[in-house]
From Swiss-Prot:
This is Phosphoribosylformylglycinamidine cyclo-ligase. Pathway: Purine metabolism; IMP biosynthesis via de novo pathway; 5-amino-1-(5-phospho-D-ribosyl)imidazole from N(2)-formyl-N(1)-(5-phospho-D-ribosyl)glycinamide: step 2/2. GO terms for cellular component: cytosol. It comes from Lactococcus lactis subsp. cremoris (strain MG1363). GO terms for biological process: 'de novo' IMP biosynthetic process; adenine biosynthetic process. HAMAP family: AIRS. GO terms for molecular function: ATP binding; phosphoribosylamine-glycine ligase activity; phosphoribosylformylglycinamidine cyclo-ligase activity. It is an enzyme of class 6 (ligase). Belongs to the AIR synthase family. Its EC number is 6.3.3.1. InterPro entries: PurM-like_C_dom (IPR010918), PurM-like_C_sf (IPR036676), PurM-like_N (IPR016188), PurM-like_N_sf (IPR036921), PurM_cligase (IPR004733). SUPFAM superfamilies: PurM C-terminal domain-like, PurM N-terminal domain-like.
Amino acid sequence: MTVSENAYAKSGVDVEAGYEVVSRIKKHVAKTERLGVLGALGGFGGSFDLSVLDVKEPVLISGTDGVGTKLMLAIRADKHDTIGIDCVAMCVNDIIAAGAEPLYFLDYIATGKNIPEKLEQVVAGVAEGCLQAGAALIGGETAEMPGMYDEDDYDLAGFAVGVAEKSQLIDGEKDVEAGDVLLGLASSGIHSNGYSLVRKVFADFDLNESLPELDQSLIDTLLTPTKIYVKELLPLIKQNKIKGIAHITGGGFHENLPRMFGNSLSAEIVEGSWDVLPIFKALEKYGSIKHEEMYEIFNMGIGMVIAVAPENAAALKKELNAFEIGQMVNRQEAPVVIKK
């Protein structure tokens, strides 16, 4: 070891552990390779050849996101193998809402101490998310930052790039109209938003125990990975069957639904038209959260909403195993109306 390496190690940065992380994650990255990827892991930049795609007028669409304080629960439970799926899901679900097929993904991990076994689990989850989305994991960065983070802490963010045929871009503001049917695709759980409130509600609970409302431990319920909707929606986008898409994340129904239609319309949602997952009932009960406010924070069991023409609604509902949760109407009051 050189003097400079020894000095760096004394400052808290373990270069050798960093090399080990790279060595460990290569097999996970390799599983995600797809047509268009150029080069191998370890270059200064990841490369992708767009010319191999059957797209006449390609439009690149990008998205970036993190996992929020759901990470704190993963760290507390020492369970790191699915949090990477969440990171990918938050990014690719956003770009599929614009009509994009995910092409590639990059991750960024910042930590107080490089622990190769743990970071391998995180990246394995990222790779699994990429597989579910059909995206290649073409690069990333792991930054060891002693003094910035405690040794056990880390943060995770991701960046997705996708492509859409210009004529198939989802433009709900232009295409969604009164009378269109709203179909809801079930969520897998809380997904990756609202966790600062979730942690507060369950701060004094034993996370390894269950609740009367749940069929598994509380921690397993809270760490259920975010569902990725790419493979369900992409074929329908290419068939021009979808007029608008809303990814129900932070801000719940009230913030995200209006992002897929114009100011002259309202989304009329019929409460009781889908199965609200037990974890949301538990949050409302134990957190003493107002029922109306739940729709302003959480997905309530619906992770993605699509607007479709009435004549296509029945077939698409069956194909997607979706719920018919409401319709678009001319605006007379708020942008989103929850009808009991």
